[in-house]
A protein has these predicted regions:
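N-terminal functional module of multi-domain proteins
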Residues: 29-91
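Alpha-helix-loop-beta-strand connector modules within alpha/beta enzyme cores
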Residues: 99-117, 165-185, 230-263, 316-319
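Glycine/Thr-rich beta-alpha phosphate-binding loop at enzyme active sites
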Residues: 143-171, 197-198, 204-254, 297
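An N-cap/entry alpha-helix motif that binds or orients negatively charged groups
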Residues: 1-46, 50
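Active-site beta->alpha loop and helix N-cap motifs at the rims of alpha/beta catalytic domains
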Residues: 58-60, 67, 82-167
Length: 334
């Protein structure tokens, strides 16, 4: 007791907060709940039962460290009941050399969502050739629940080795949905999406849309950093165009108020989600069932040690429990 009181005195002057620091997204209701003790309530998402509203967003797919990182991620998903999207599976589409790095079903278990991932450029080639059998084999071999399609026109344009699209991605996606029976998620890669793209996807029978919004890892910028100085200077402003997760959530809500037939009814809110408070706020603001995803945060800790990764997820889950008890989101703007 004496030590605690001494700490309070020593730290009091360091703990003053300014009005500019207040988080105006929430009402704080300290009288209305007891401290949360039990775990989060389980819920259905992507056809599986999850125990926390957190998604491991697709990351790197073909590096020397990918195997250990991926297995750490799958292990933590199983421990806490999260879902997971693999990084690009292109390295194992035709060659099994790196397959063990992606073979995670036994690690994550059968009860949680686990998705393969390919770029729209690879999908376009197969759709135009009327042969998606390599994708079917990939999903079956991985025992994945379905496919994430990452749509990345700016990245492909800026990438020296990039593939230029011969038709609008929405046409490729629409045709692929007619050819496959597997669930499909569509995501961007760090720019987010505007209203016309979101509207088009909401009208398709997708399992979910993942935002991959502006504010997180930006793969257009990644490609610029790989290029020469002149290209970086000339095309640099392109990487600053996009939509953050807050804007995209409101765009989706506005589209839902329109008189359209919505077939895609689940959202993974990702891109710039720096804390559990960001995720909690946006999944509660969204009118569709939603969870939140992170990529770089998981990558950081998964590449260090499992203990660090476990603590990272544990604190997020505890934070969501705290938020459920005491924080109510405001309808007003930030």
């Amino acid at each position: 007791m004496t030590d605690r009181k001494k700490d309070h005195i020593d730290l009091a002057f360091k703990s003053k907060t300014g009005l500019e620091e207040i988080d105006r997204r929430f009402f704080y209701e300290p009288l209305m709940a007891k401290h949360p003790v039990a775990g989060l309530a389980s819920f259905k998402f992507l056809g599986k039962t999850m125990r926390a509203p957190i998604w491991v967003s697709s990351m790197t797919g073909g590096t020397q460290l990918a195997g250990q990182i991926n297995h750490n991620l799958a292990k933590v998903c199983r421990e806490f009941g999260l879902g997971m999207g693999l990084g690009s599976c292109r390295p194992i589409l035709q060659n099994d050399e790196h397959f063990p790095d992606f073979d995670l079903r036994d690690t994550i278990g059968d009860d949680l969502p686990f998705y393969a991932n390919l770029g729209i450029a690879q999908l376009e080639d197969m759709v135009l050739n009327d042969d998606i059998s390599p994708i079917d084999r990939l999903i079956e071999k991985l025992r994945a629940d379905g496919l994430i399609i990452h749509v990345n026109p700016l990245q492909e344009w800026l990438q020296p080795e990039g593939n230029l699209f011969s038709q609008p991605p929405v046409d490729t996606i629409r045709t692929y949905l007619e050819m496959t029976n597997y669930p499909v998620i569509v995501k961007e890669v760090g720019q987010g999406m505007g209203p016309e793209s979101l509207r088009a996807l909401l009208e398709l029978p997708l399992e979910a849309i993942e935002m991959a919004a502006f504010g997180g890892t930006n793969f257009a910028k990644v490609e610029l950093l790989r290029s020469d100085d002149f290209k970086q200077q000339y095309f640099g402003p392109v990487s600053h165009i996009g939509h953050d997760a807050f804007e995209m959530t409101d765009l989706i809500n506005e589209i839902l108020d329109e008189n359209i037939t919505v077939k895609c009814k689940q959202i993974i809110i990702s891109g710039g989600i720096s804390s559990f408070l960001d995720g909690y706020y946006l999944i509660n603001r969204c009118k569709l069932p939603a969870i939140y995803g992170q990529a770089s945060g998981f990558l950081k800790y998964a590449s260090q040690s499992y203990d660090e990764l476990e603590k990272f997820v544990e604190y997020q889950v505890e934070g969501i429990k705290l938020a459920n008890a005491y924080f109510v989101i405001k309808d007003s703007e930030r």
